[in-house]
């Protein structure tokens, strides 16, 4: 569903910007296929400024459909969105994007990369980053971005446990809105406070007690 390496390249080198709106975007009513088929019924979700949402559900339940609609609405609302797909179609392109950045901006991204456990100097001289290195580099770019929203689809793919723990800390410090698709329960518990559960053609909204920021 994501054509996001273009989005990623455009987002690199910026920092979080608060749009000032309390509700960034809403999705309400039925979500239909172009042919008219109802894919999700009676949806009623709103992403608020600074809200941290996990989108959960079985494979094929409609998570990608909900995210596609959410991203379209965010685009219509002119929100700056940082997006990480489940898989990067061209990991080497991420590295090339970083190499072409202004030195000050590149330094900021590489500094964030170091906090994710990667030696920036080693990555910059490689011919082709590993899947894990490319993913961390993409995450470093997004975490250094001017974005009011991060949308991350299975960000722990290709990451080892220490890297996942560093990502948990980085997302806990992120002060924009976050929409996270993950099967990693520890990451979800550390980074999100609300769950949008997609099942049986519907979206159930649940406030997750005991998570950060939840009474």
Locate predicted features.
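Coiled-coil termination/hinge junctions
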Residues: 1-26
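ABC ATP-binding cassette signature C-motif
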Residues: 17-215
